């Protein structure tokens, strides 16, 4: 029950402010947030894993069968991801692109991207086992994003965009499913309560860095 309570709490904390924001704006008429920035796992990866050597990919059928154009973009979904729906509802953009997409436009950078990588987690060991982008590397990509944004819009406007951006972090289940319950190293080091506290501490550290 501990991991489930943690996930439910995270969803509750994220949903309340977003539900107010969605009620405060007519879709596609005005923006509450100038940009959206995403960190996490397969729940928020729009295709970053397409550009790294990992088995955790979703750029083939049946993924994307309900996506516009019926294209498998790398999203672990038959259609859009939650960040896409939020970005559209909040009037930011129709789709949140992958930061590693080489076709990323200046307009995409102005309105935000996702650094998420399917198979990742708060525990670096989780991402290492899956050969995907760990959270700390996602932070490095975020720093690179800031530099690119500053070159496009200037330092002052970049600060305004970043300060007003909606930031979403979605991860944690892989730390338990692909790590704690699947390989012995962490389960020998922690009991379930101890590992939950470890993951929560990693989340808190990540938020402080962001």
For the regions a protein language model found, what residue spans apply to each?
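Conserved active-site regions of diverse hydrolases
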Residues: 2-210
């Amino acid at each position: 029950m501990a991991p489930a309570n943690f996930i439910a709490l995270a969803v509750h904390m994220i949903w309340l402010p977003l539900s107010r924001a969605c009620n405060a704006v007519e879709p596609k008429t005005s923006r509450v947030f100038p940009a959206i920035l995403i960190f996490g796992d397969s729940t928020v990866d729009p295709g970053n894993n397409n550009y790294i050597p990992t088995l955790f990919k979703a750029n083939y059928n049946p993924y994307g069968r309900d996506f516009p154009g019926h294209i498998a973009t790398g999203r672990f979904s038959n259609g859009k991801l939650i960040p896409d729906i939020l970005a559209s509802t909040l009037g930011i953009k129709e789709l949140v692109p992958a930061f590693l997409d080489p076709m990323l436009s200046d307009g995409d950078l102005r309105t935000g991207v996702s650094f998420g990588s399917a198979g990742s987690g708060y525990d670096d060991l989780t991402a290492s086992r899956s050969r995907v982008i760990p959270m700390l590397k996602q932070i490095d990509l975020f720093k690179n994003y800031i530099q690119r944004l500053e070159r496009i819009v200037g330092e002052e406007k970049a600060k305004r965009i970043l300060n007003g951006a909606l930031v979403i972090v979605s991860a944690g289940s892989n730390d338990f499913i692909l790590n704690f319950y699947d390989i012995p190293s962490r389960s020998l080091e922690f009991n379930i309560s101890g590992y939950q506290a470890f993951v929560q501490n990693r989340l808190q550290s990540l938020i402080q860095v962001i």
